[in-house]
Amino acid sequence: MKNDFVVIDITTNGLDEDSEIVSFAALRFENGVPTDRFFEYVNSGAVLSDSISEILGFTNDTLQRYGTTMEDAYWQFIEFCSGGDLITMHHDFDSKFIERMCREYDLPVLENHITDLDTMFRLKYKRGYSTRFAENQLGISTDETDEWRYLDIAGKAYIALHIN
């Protein structure tokens, strides 16, 4: 089992296929322990509705002030992820946005090995991945106030599924 990997997540401004990526996040694990973090807002002109803003915890103003271009954000993201196996929580969802973005901006698609937790959970538990289910089913505990906890839980779930 590999204990060195990167848990990745993208955030979009909606769930439909026309939605845009508004952030990239990644948490690197080495020897099964989180060691490095990456986060970048994207300022591509995508608009967040009030309801999406409430769910995500950031606003259009946040994207405009702190976001970088899609190209810069993605290059930083793939640089951070280079050399590591990637763990996703919902690969089917994330991949369609990443692939479309790569086509639109003429950027390279990630070539890392990818493992999808949603698929792993469906095979083992007959239901998809969720942070709460992973915590309860696998007995994972984290600091409730840590904004990175959802990536930490995903990494620990990946490790736990390979041990059991």
Model-derived features: where do they sit?
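Short alpha-helix plus adjacent loop in nuclease-associated cores
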Residues: 114-136
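Acidic active-site catalytic centers that drive phospho-/nucleotidyl reactions
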Residues: 9-11, 94, 116, 150, ...
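Conserved non-catalytic scaffold segment of RNase H-like nuclease domains
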Residues: 1-107, 111, 132-142
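Generic structural signal for hydrophobic core residues of well-folded globular domains
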Residues: 101-102, 124, 161
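Acidic two-metal-ion nuclease catalytic site recognized across multiple nuclease folds
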Residues: 137, 142-164
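Generic hydrophobic secondary-structure packing signal
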Residues: 69, 130-131, 150-153
